[in-house]
Design a protein with these regions (language model features):
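A structural signal for small-residue-enriched, beta-sheet-centric alpha/beta enzyme cores
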Residues: 180-186
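Aromatic/hydrophobic pocket-lining residues that form π-stacking "cages" and hydrophobic walls in ligand
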Residues: 100, 161, 330
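Non-transmembrane, aqueous-exposed alpha-helical and coiled segments at domain scale
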Residues: 159-166
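Conserved small/polar residues in nucleotide/adenosyl-binding loops
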Residues: 327-337
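Short gly/pro-enriched beta-turn/loop segments at secondary-structure junctions
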Residues: 135-138, 167-171, 176-178, 268
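Beta-strand elements within well-structured catalytic alpha/beta cores of enzymes
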Residues: 48-54, 143, 170-180
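Flexible, D/E/H-enriched segments
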Residues: 1-48, 59-156, 187-326
């Protein structure tokens, strides 16, 4: 059996517009065309496994992995139900799901498989598999995004997945179903009026895409907390998919990236990005965080705050030097409070 590997990675948007209404907005059509191009790339690579990390499947009790060999249902989006419904019938690799579950627990993670009739597949996974694997030719696996998982836990989740990919000799494609900026309009808008929610969101999105196109995936992961504070709705789920995707690619900055499309979906930043593991040979890296192999502790209530916070700048007193004595400005002190 050949050594398994991740042959490609993709970032894809989560909302149903690209499936149900691509022609209502030129930007949605561009995203749909980018999905189609990504699907062709996956087919050309002869991948034999699609791995979906979806931000629209939140979990609290550990990491959940879809293990129903053929989940069938009809998905209606909670917000955009007016667009219609998406029937689905997916080809899930249950053997890989169970092996990943075992590997998670071997590395200290809380993990379980899900397999019962009627369990709803989230919108991000439905959109990704419907458009990237339209004929169900390639088996897939879907993992939840644990709401409280910090960088350490998310990195270990990826490494346990890599354990199974290598053990089974798979040609895998890693896919994060996510938005860039996720601030959305809170009222109805006409499709023709869709745009990124704010200029600030757009500027940050473009900087993220610049890094990804340069193959600097780990740099994006290292900036995850800053990105979350700047352009993400402040909730428990952080900008953690980049932690997972970077770890799936060996925490590298010398990848080959290509942005296939970037457009707004009801104000959120939607992008289709292809990340090729081929090295550009120019990616320097200066990491601020440790590499981890095992998860050794439970999530605490302070973890989320720790993940959001950056160290405060230290105040350094001026160096002593041969100079004049300090001057007391008494006329200014009178105004101090």
């Amino acid at each position: 059996m050949s050594q398994g590997e991740v042959v490609a990675s993709f970032v894809v948007p989560v909302h149903p517009h690209t499936v149900l209404a691509p022609d209502q907005n030129p930007g949605w059509r561009k995203l749909r065309d980018a999905f189609d191009e990504a699907a062709q790339t996956i087919q050309d690579l002869e991948a034999d496994l699609l791995i979906i990390y979806s931000t629209t499947w939140p979990s609290i009790i550990g990491h959940q992995i879809q293990a129903d060999p053929n989940p069938e249902w009809v998905m209606v989006d909670h917000d955009f139900h007016d667009l219609g419904s998406i029937p689905y019938s997916f080809n899930i690799d249950a053997d890989f799901a169970h092996a990943w579950d075992d590997a998670n627990r071997n590395r200290g993670l809380q993990s379980r498989c899900v397999n019962y009739k009627g369990f709803p597949i989230d919108v991000g996974s439905v959109v990704a598999l419907t458009l990237l694997n339209p004929d169900n030719r390639i088996p897939a696996v879907i993992v939840s995004s644990n709401m409280y998982a910090n960088r350490t836990e998310t990195t270990v989740l990826a490494k346990s997945c890599l354990d199974v990919i290598q053990a089974q000799g798979r040609k895998a494609v890693a896919i994060t179903a996510m938005s860039l900026s996720n601030r959305m309009f809170t009222d109805f808008i006409e499709a023709k009026d869709d745009k990124i929610h704010s200029l600030k969101d757009d500027e940050w999105n473009r900087k993220i895409l610049e890094f990804l196109e340069q193959g600097r995936l780990e740099d994006v992961g290292q900036l995850s907390r800053t990105i979350h504070r700047q352009i993400r709705v402040q909730k428990v789920v952080a900008f953690k998919p980049m932690w997972w995707l970077s770890a799936m690619n060996g925490n590298r900055n010398d990848l080959t990236g290509r942005v296939l499309a970037y457009e707004a979906i009801h104000g959120a930043g939607g992008a289709v990005v292809h990340i090729d593991p081929t090295s550009t040979g120019i990616g320097d890296k200066e990491y601020d965080e440790d590499d981890v192999e095992y998860f050794h502790g439970e999530r605490g209530v302070l973890d989320a705050d720790d993940e959001q916070a950056e160290p405060a700048p230290q105040s350094t007193p001026p160096a002593e030097a041969n100079g004049p004595e300090p001057v007391s400005y008494t006329h200014l002190r009178a105004h101090e409070t």
